[in-house]
Amino acid sequence: MKIVRNVWLAIVAIVMMGCVDKKPFFEMRGAVLAVEDLETADWPRIAYENGINTLGTHITPNQVLRFWESEKGKQFQEECRRYGIKVEHELHAMKDLLPRELFDMDSTMFRMDESGRRVADFNCCVSSARALDTIAAQALFYAQHLTSTNHRYYFWLDDGAPICQCPECSTLSASEQALIIENRMLTAIRTYDKEAMVAHLAYYSSLKAPEKVKPEEGIFLEFAPFQRRLDKPINDSISEVSDIGNNAVNLTYLKENLKVFPVETAVVLDYWLDVSMASRWKKPAVELPWNGDVFRSDVDTYAAMGIRNVTTFAVYMDSTYFATYPRTDYLKEYGAAINR
C-alpha cells in the first residue's frame, strides 16, 4: 500500500508541475497606451493585475522620448521592471524620421504626387538613398534612446496617407514602399541591438501583402484590422463594413501576409479596448462599448491561424477615464482570454 501511495503522490506531483509550468498560448498579451494615459494612470499595476505582459507606448517618437526621459517616464520604467512587464513603442514615426524641414534642403527625399510635384505632406520617396539613410539614422537614434525590452521596434509610416508616385516608386504598392523602409531600418538598428526585429504594419492602404519586395530576416508582421466592426466577430462575412466589404475580408489579407511573413513572430494589433476609436478620437471619452463574446471569438480565430502575439489599443484610458467610468471588468475578461 505504501508503494501504491508513493506512486500516486508522484503522479499528483507530476500533474501539478505540469499545471504550474503550462504557459499561455499567446506569448505577447499586450495593450497600447498614449503618453497621457501612462502619465496619469498606473498602467504597470493594471497590466500586472489583469494578465497583460506587454505595454506599448504611443503616439510619436519625440512625444514618447520626452515622456521616457521625464520623472514620470522613469517611474513607469521602474514599475514595469518590478512587475515583469515588457515595454515596446508603437509609433507614428515618419515626420520624426524624416523631418519636414529637410524639404528645402533636398526635395527629392520627399514623395512625388500624382501631378509630378514633390510635396512634404506625407511619407517619403523610397527611391531616394538619402531619404532612406536619414530615416535609418533617425530610427537608430530612437531605438538607442527608447529601450524596447522585447527587441521589437515599430516605426510606422503616415496613416493611410498618400505614397510616392515618382517613376521609380509608382510601380510599388504601399506595403512594398513600407517594406523597403523597414528593411533599411532593421539593418541600422541591428548595429545597436543584434536581436532587433522591425514591424511591417499591414493596415488600411498597406493591408495587401507585398510581392515585389521581400522582407529581411527580422521583419515581423503587425496586422491591424482598422476597417472592421467591433460589434461583430472578425470572421463575420455578413455585416457590411465600408471600404472593405465585411470583417472577414481582413482575414483574407492576413492569410496572404502570413505567406510572406513568419506566423511565429506575427502580431495582431486590434481595437477591442480602444476608447479613442469609440470616442471618434475626441475627448471627453465615451465609455468603452465592450463586446466580450466578440473579443473571445476573435482571439480564438487568431489562435486557429497560428497567431501567438496579440495586443490592443487602449488609448484614452487615463485617470480621468477610470474616474468617470470605474467599471473595469472588461480588463479581467481581456486578461483571462489571452492567458488561456
Language-model segments: what does each one mean?
Residues 15-25:
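Bacterial Sec-dependent signal peptides at the C-terminal "C-region" and cleavage site
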Residues 6-16:
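Sec-dependent N-terminal signal peptides
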